């Protein structure tokens, strides 16, 4: 029997991007963010647009209950390598495209069971917009479709190297071969529905699963993906 085993695991992580190297400011702003949710023990990836004292920054994050895992290559790359801290490749730029159409639902606060569909009426201070983006064409390699205020519905599939990101649910009526990210921003109730699952990555509210770890019984099948009570991804095969 082998003494070493490598297994895949779905990990909940967050990416933190710093636009300042003032640790007092970082501590204050992070404290406000951490007080708003249950982030204690969260694994984090560090990105920065400015120079940092990386060791001090890592120590600061640890002291606040976070678990730094790696940095994004770029400004911090050389410093991380010098201390043998993991470095992840920088993001490849994708072409962000516009959806074929959008529908805006205006929900008055306090939330009621009714929502009215609006297209031109401006929002007031007591209203929340939920936007559904519709796209009729296949999402091609290098393209990204993003909706940070609601759901996305793809009426065709998506190619490898493409990406779809929504703060809410994602419905794909075709084959999925790219990256599908629902619940962006932490919406754990978000769900993913697709007609044929061959994704490079699926994620809901930061909990992700790469292609090799997707359960074999749902590959190339209609699938419903959601987070269970333990905040783990569940893959439910659908009968169509």
UniProtKB/Swiss-Prot annotation:
SUPFAM superfamilies: Cell-division inhibitor MinC, C-terminal domain (SSF63848). Keywords: Cell cycle, Cell division, Septation. Coiled coil: none annotated. It comes from the Bacteria. InterPro entries: CAP/MinC_C, MinC, MinC_C_sf, MinC_N, Septum_form_inhib_MinC_C. Pfam families: MinC_C, MinC_N. GO terms for biological process: cell morphogenesis; division septum assembly; regulation of cell division; regulation of cell septum assembly. Interacts with MinD and FtsZ. Belongs to the MinC family. Cell division inhibitor that blocks the formation of polar Z ring septums. Rapidly oscillates between the poles of the cell to destabilize FtsZ filaments that have formed before they mature into polar Z rings. Prevents FtsZ polymerization. This is Probable septum site-determining protein MinC.
């Amino acid at each position: 029997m082998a003494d070493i085993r490598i297994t895949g695991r779905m990990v909940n992580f967050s990416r933190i991007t710093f636009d300042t190297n003032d640790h007092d400011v970082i501590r204050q702003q992070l404290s406000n963010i951490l007080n708003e949710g249950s982030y204690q023990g969260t694994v984090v990836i560090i990105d920065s647009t400015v120079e940092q004292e990386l060791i001090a920054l890592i120590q600061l994050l640890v002291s606040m209950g976070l678990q730094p895992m790696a940095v994004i290559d770029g400004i911090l790359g050389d410093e991380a390598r010098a201390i043998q801290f993991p470095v992840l490749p920088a993001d490849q730029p994708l072409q962000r495209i516009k959806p074929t159409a959008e529908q805006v639902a205006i929900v008055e606060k306090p939330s009621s069971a009714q929502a009215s569909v609006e297209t031109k009426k401006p929002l007031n201070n007591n209203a929340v917009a939920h936007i559904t983006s519709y796209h009729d064409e296949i999402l091609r390699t290098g393209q990204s479709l993003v909706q940070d205020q609601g759901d996305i519905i793809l009426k065709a599939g998506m190619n490898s190297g493409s990406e779809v990101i929504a703060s809410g649910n994602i419905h794909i009526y075709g084959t999925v071969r790219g990256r599908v990210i629902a619940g962006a921003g932490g919406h754990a109730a978000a769900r993913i529905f697709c007609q044929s699952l061959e994704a490079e990555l699926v994620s809901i509210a930061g909990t992700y699963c790469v292609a090799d770890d997707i359960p074999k019984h749902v590959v190339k099948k209609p699938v419903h993906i959601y987070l269970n009570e333990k905040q783990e991804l569940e893959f439910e095969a659908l009968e169509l």
